[in-house]
């Protein structure tokens, strides 16, 4: 049975650590980086904040601090939670070959359900996501309650997808709840109108069922849906 290769994964976390810190309109408070959420950090043995965008010594010290944390990490969870939510799916794409099936399953579920918009991750295609979901063990991918609901899905059933303005109509997140789809169709619209898609799904094509955010979510590749229409 394949086990998780922590040594190889640590080297990838280190490479993520050295990504350039990109500024945003809210910098230094908010930055774009796989690990750092802010350019303002607290250093060990110090009680004042430092701006690592301007202070090279502070930047080097915080990098050394993280390098030591990565080196001392003794579990995949410790490494995984160093990565920001918006980068977790990308991280999994890079470490997938070093993960046990159990760890791939639990981490993919966490990354998917914690991401604000996993269907439009520019670094991970829907084809790659589908392949990763197919590799998982569904008993580890889902909670006991989710797995029970998944097992009891009918052979064919109706699903909906709320598509807000500017969002991907071919995403993998669908739901059995029309009310949930309505909510998503109006999310982030800012005055523009979204819409609801309806389709027929086959149980054999369902990649996962998640309800940890009360969204009654059916994860399925849109290519496997039938009778897609707009309500």
Predicted feature residues:
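Conserved NAD+-utilizing ADP-ribose enzyme module
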Residues: 1-157, 164-172, 178-231
């Amino acid at each position: 049975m394949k086990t998780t290769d922590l040594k190889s994964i640590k080297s990838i976390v280190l490479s993520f650590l050295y990504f350039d810190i990109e500024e945003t309109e809210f910098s230094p408070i908010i930055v774009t980086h796989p690990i750092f959420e802010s350019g303002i950090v607290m250093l060990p043995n110090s009680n004042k904040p430092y701006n690592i965008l301007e202070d090279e010594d502070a930047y080097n010290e915080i990098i050394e601090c993280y390098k030591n944390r990565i080196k001392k990490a003794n579990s995949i969870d410790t490494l995984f939670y160093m990565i920001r939510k918006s980068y977790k799916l990308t991280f999994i794409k890079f470490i997938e070959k070093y993960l046990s099936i159990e760890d791939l399953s639990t981490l993919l579920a966490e990354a998917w359900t914690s991401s604000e918009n996993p269907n439009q991750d520019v670094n991970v295609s829907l084809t790659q996501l589908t392949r990763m979901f197919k590799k998982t063990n569904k008993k580890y991918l889902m909670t006991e309650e989710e797995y029970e609901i998944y097992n009891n899905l009918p052979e064919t059933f109706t699903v909906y997808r709320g598509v807000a303005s500017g969002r991907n109509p071919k995403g993998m997140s669908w739901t059995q709840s029309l009310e949930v789809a309505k909510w998503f169709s109006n999310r982030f619209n800012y005055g523009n109108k979204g819409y609801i898609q309806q389709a027929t799904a086959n149980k054999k094509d369902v990649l996962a069922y998640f309800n940890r955010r009360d969204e009654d979510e059916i994860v399925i590749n849109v290519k496997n849906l039938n009778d897609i229409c707009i309500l």
